[in-house]
């Protein structure tokens, strides 16, 4: 390959002559394409001719402009073979340019490609025989030894990337997921075509699974890569490499091929779309979002629930809502839940401006109240932008708060009206189970339900009735109807004797257990929020033995602990012992924590579920939480004048019909008169002499002595005009 270096100095005469001849011939061929009069033999001879020199930079600008100016004619020849030859001519020209000239060529080619409203690159690929196979062979060569790749292979891959960016880049990234060691080399090739990257908006063809809009090449390819990997069985290693690829793309050399904002937008939109198969794809996407939100502090956050997606900011209210919905989804993994919590926490810490009044009211009054208290408390704590004056907590925790701190908290109650609303949403099947649950439950269990903490009801709901947890108050709804629930099943137990048969001998233990149950539930969701509640608590334990007993009972009865692993259980128990067991030694803390971990079953379940899916929904764009209703102008006439009496309506219809007939008659007469005028005008010979093309003069010389008089039209004068020259 000829050394590709810029040379603005005038080359030697021999090279300059070769340049002139070569450039002139290529210009003639390009011009023949413009006239659709191409000599196929000449084109083939030009392509077969070997040229071992670089085109002088002085000629390349005009030559590149000609190639783009005639490009549309070149790829639309009647003979498809000639169109394919035009692409080969452009490829030959591109290979003989210096690096600065290649950059100019690339810029002009992208302009020509983007000039049209429709993306024609899928058609371009048909003009290159075995286009995808060539890309695959090039990538195979790169995989053999990524450190030592021939320059010809690199330049060929670069040309394919310029010629068809989406297909080539998608194939490159797909291979990078399988052979991650070639990522560095492939990204260097991308850097050689900067006209396609660095968040430049491009008009690109979108499939039916994508929202058609102008966006960057990297954003579209990354989204399509996720789609393709969900469509087929993809290994965990490839999904892990996808996360690494996103990190390399955004955190590489400056400026990076893709900034953090468009990548985060793609990832959040994919989480927003109801595509949850395979689950590992959701885990990877949420992990990417966590890394971006935590490490990039220059992101913009919407403070209004009406902010539109086009404003290039994160729609924070909408993001809060759909991430909370993912967290309470029973089908998502713990990894996804933890990542969503980290995203929300990072966004809350990064937001500097408070939400506007409408967004605050909507989120606190309508959204957060629909979720369990742990989510409401955590969001109110993380998002200072909500400016929540009093964070709501359950009664068991609220009663234990220090008197001086109670002004910053509020008791979360469950109204009867809300309970009735929730009851309507409960399954009839579940209601049947509630009403017909019978002798399989022991009397001891039933008695403890009526007199223990609300936790026992929670356990019964989850373990014995097999009810699905509901976002709003599946637990609280059952708590609200607990006395009636127990009375239906155990009618033989007199209410006045309930206090004597409680499973707890000491009512203080019952209160403490209920309190720790709430703290554990909060700790499973967020350990820092649980620690804050304990620090503001007035609860005390008489001894370390009492604390250990209450902790074991609370951990054993808490159904949320099933979502926590051994490490989280150790953290929660450690925090409880740190706050309430300060008199105990560290060895006692370790012993108690170890005994609790042994008490809680922590079986590790294998990841199951489909590895791929063809039931993939169209990728959606995050929408505003509140979509304003645009005011429409009232139709005319006003409503009070729209009534028309029956007789008037027929009269108006008749008049309208008559007007249409007269209009048609007038139009017909006008056309006839215009045609008659044109015919009469054309019959006039005088008009025809001035408006028609004159006859060509004869070829005889003006000074020739000939008896034959030249025949000319009056437009060139009669023969007498030339007689004076003949004399």
Curated annotation (Swiss-Prot):
The gene is edg-1. Transmembrane segments: none annotated. Residues 703-727 are annotated as: Disordered. This is Protein edg-1. It comes from the Eukaryota. InterPro entries: TPR_Edg1 (IPR056581). Plays a role in regulating deps-1 cluster formation in the germline. It comes from Caenorhabditis elegans. May interact with deps-1 and prg-1. It holds the Pfam family TPR_Edg1. Disruption phenotype: RNAi-mediated knockdown results in enlarged deps-1-containing clusters. It is found in: Cytoplasmic granule.
